[in-house]
Amino acid sequence: MSHAAYARTAQFSSPREVEAQTLLMAARKLVEVQTNWNGPDKKMQAALLFNRRLWTIFMGAAESNDNPQPLEVRQNILNIAIFVMQRTIEMQTNPTPEKLQPLIDINANIAAGLSGRP
């Protein structure tokens, strides 16, 4: 999502909905790579980079002293983010389409929770 598109979305949606939509966008990019697997290519690298940047933002927010979430919630976010980073490194060093599935599932499940959807 371009910065302009993100800004437009942010104007009309709650922060939770923006986060959910961005997680779904990351999941779609990863699904596209997995479905059209050609080995490690530019699309894989771009999808992993987008996902890693997103989770880096979540990590920063969870670590912030200004974050109003309970400590346990923040710690859970950090634990998930650490897993995402580790899996991303695994994908970059020994890529297989199967290793993308946990990243896809995490993003989709958290997006559903943020949106209030099962």
Per-segment meaning from a language model:
Residues 1-57, 63-64, 68, 74-118:
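N-terminal intrinsically disordered, cationic/polar leader segments
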